[in-house]
Amino acid sequence: MTTAATPSVGLVGWRGMVGSVLMQRMQDEGDFATINPVFFSTSNAGGPAPSLAGPAGGDTGRLEDAFDVETLAKLPMIVTAQGGEYTKQIHSALRSRGWDGLWIDAASTLRMNDDSIIVLDPINRDVIDKGLANGTKDFIGGNCTVSCMLMGLGGLFKNGLVEWGTSMTYQAASGGGARHMRELLSQFGTLNAQVSSELSDPASAILEIDRKVLAHQRSGIDATQFGVPLAGSLIPWIDADLGNGQSKEEWKAGKETNKILGTSGDEHIIMDGLCIRIGAMRSHSQALTLKLREDLSVPEIEKLLDADNEWATVVPNTKEASMEELTPVAASGTLKIPVGRLRKLEMGPQYISAFTVGDQLLWGAAEPLRRMLKIATGNL
């Protein structure tokens, strides 16, 4: 099933939203030419596998059963975007029978385990390489906002220049999943339908339009996925309530930042803030306050950010550039991580503001997995 040149790789969850983006990126970059893909399905085992440009001329055969541990265990690598429940069920079953292959996973289930590494190679390639050399087998994608933050501000974080920071996020509907994105658009459409005749009349009273919209938001709009209306509003809480006033999404900021960077002791970075769901489709934004360990000028900071990786894009701190380049609309569907609103704050010379945007489905989810697979197969 595997040769030294073209290892077999199990692919699970490839039809979902993150999985679909991952498959498209792998096709775009020619990744299937370096592996023998083995496609698995949780619902259509035996059906035809997708035809992709791999070493077997695109013939990838039939879909395997994603719950067939025996078949999975024959593979040296598995990449999954099937979700946390699948990981809980299958990962432990594989490990308990002695499988020692590489598990590359988009779900958060294994993310904070001591024996796993959160993958974001432009930021922590040294951590990944050390893990591979030391026998680490579980490589997990990070939280989307944390990954996008570090990609944009890597020049500060990697150089040990951040003492602490707060991150106030503006997170897109895609973070909830495909159904959440559909619900957001449906809510916008429903609200528009309530007042379409009034909107077509320039003489109609805007306060009456607003009253009708608000009444529908409060009583008649479908919010099955989000729980409350998001269109024309926001949701000031994401993920579980930890019982201490903090959401799980907010807890991830500090925990994952330090795990990705491998920082501890005196190098530990304190990160906290609030996570907010807004009516954007697929790009997360965040406003940051950072206390630096040194007094750096804004041009020095911009130079560090620009030099760190090819995807971080410094946006000039002007109204025009910010409105055009530092938005979810500008970032969505691209690998660019715009970072702007960089300036010194009134609190002191070591305090700066920053604003980053990144596609939640690319650097926030699929791209780190794609690149980890290339690293694991010796192609990056």
Feature map (PLM): residue ranges:
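Glycine-rich beta-alpha junction loops
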Residues: S43-A45, C144-T145, T169-G176, D222, ...
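N-terminal Rossmann-like NAD(P) cofactor-binding subdomain of oxidoreductases
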Residues: T2-Q225, D266-I270, I337-P338, L342-G348, ...
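A glycine-rich, Thr/Ser-enriched phosphate-binding loop motif common to dinucleotide/cofactor-binding enzymes
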Residues: K137-C148, G245-K255, G364-P368
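General structural feature for long, well-ordered alpha-helical segments within catalytic domains
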Residues: W14, L22, I90, G152, ...
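C-terminal active-site/capping subdomain that shapes the small-molecule cofactor and substrate pocket
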Residues: G265-L380
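Hydrophobic, Leu/Ile/Phe/Ala-enriched alpha-helical segments that form helix-helix packing faces
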Residues: L22, M26, L94, T257-S264, ...
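Oxyanion-binding "anion nests"
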Residues: Q217-R277
